[in-house]
């Protein structure tokens, strides 16, 4: 455990020195942006103080410096990392209660920290905090199966550390389950598989094997302990003597290790890609006419459209103006933008609801996104890149657009979530797609064979009449993974064997996608309390919610792309006129207690579940959308960071009140 702690301390801390990722940009494997998390800290003294934590070698020095940092800079962007350092050094100094307190606060700000979760799970198991140990170990294993290697480690280093983390997590969970008198052989087998050199794992497994009357396996494990552990050798010899059978004790348990590893590497079961591939949305129309007609009206279908005059929502009239003279708009048979005396015609539109971007296509196949977009609610042109990028963004300089750089290229930056079946041809900037917008098969899978067999009414292959990906049969995690193809900012994109970018031609329809660690992104994407500030992280927020983690909620619990009322219900909400119905099927105890529970009159907007549990605090450029973290309101982090960096939902309506009032109200509500 001590070696594991030392191995990950620098991993977590030095991550703040690494290149960070812009928000709202495709995340490609081995690709980072040109600024660091630490460089975004404006206070130079604060940055210097944090560097002293990184440079501390002695646990006592690191403990002192980290505690000094959190005391002096209680509102720092780096609190998650600083409290992480407090927790790890406190464990080394046997300050276990303080380690748990600091570690839990760090995880509150950044829950997706598997190495810290592993350390706390082991400590909690040791202290008989079994429920917490099981929860933390399980969360760590979940994240380790999703998050790619930290960018400050090379693949070899991560390949060495990750098995240790997984082994330690399985061991902690097994130890906690064992203390609850639960049989935990499966987790111990996996722990031994990931770390076949740890005698403590084999010792605990021997005890479980004895409980199960598996004397042969127990003897083999005890023999391994006797040979490899000075600390446990005497206990192992005593137990072997009691067993009284040395005939098979010296054979090492290779069989169980190999089997556990094979079990661990099996991929989730998803419907397989069909050989005949993709049919296109029109193939769905004859059998699914209502769904097809409804989909055609949605923002998904119209995410990217070839230019048609009736699709334009921007103001290209003579009175339409941008705030700068660097660019002007006009209309000459079709809309155009003029920058540095060069004219760029609109060939495609991006978006169709409250905001619209414009694309010009070059003769060589590249599609370039004009820097300004039109915001319909405010009826104004905005510099999109300037609003979402950190200061100094090159693509936000309108006068430089005629350089037509990769930074403003549609295929490289936007197409993976705005078009269907995207494939890189000769270069990423010239990638081609089968369908503009998001079509049926992006969600339901490749359907050529399905459509062909359905058209024939072929009963020889009844399985073909089922959709390639059936949401009715999927778990909530499988279903969310489909939506996450476009709605998860942190997804790391890798090309398929034939340069496919957002679809598969063989293997699993929705393959497991690695996620870039969240602390590798620009601080502009977060509030200081750790919640997501930008709407591009909507799946990341939702997968933190108890509704997803402990329940069965998925995107389709509340949304549907097949509703007929899209013109008036642009959020595709299933219960547009009665939003509480999204929550009450699971939380039925509140159905007749809405006013009592919400402390607002039943039927009022304030009494709706989403008003308190999904507040409008997330940026969508010029307006706010609802957070999808779905949490119980608190006030303590607002007291620490302030309303701007930790919005309290009560104060978003009761603006005349203060945070002390909010805390008192929430305390009374809980009591």
Pin down the residues of each PLM region:
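Primarily the internal scaffold of c-type cytochrome electron-transfer domains
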Residues: 216, 244-247, 251-275, 282, ...
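Alpha-solenoid helical repeat scaffolds
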Residues: 80-85, 115-119, 151-156, 168-172, ...
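Alpha-helical linker/edge segments of TPR/alpha-solenoid repeat scaffolds
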Residues: 92-97, 126-133, 163-179, 211-220, ...
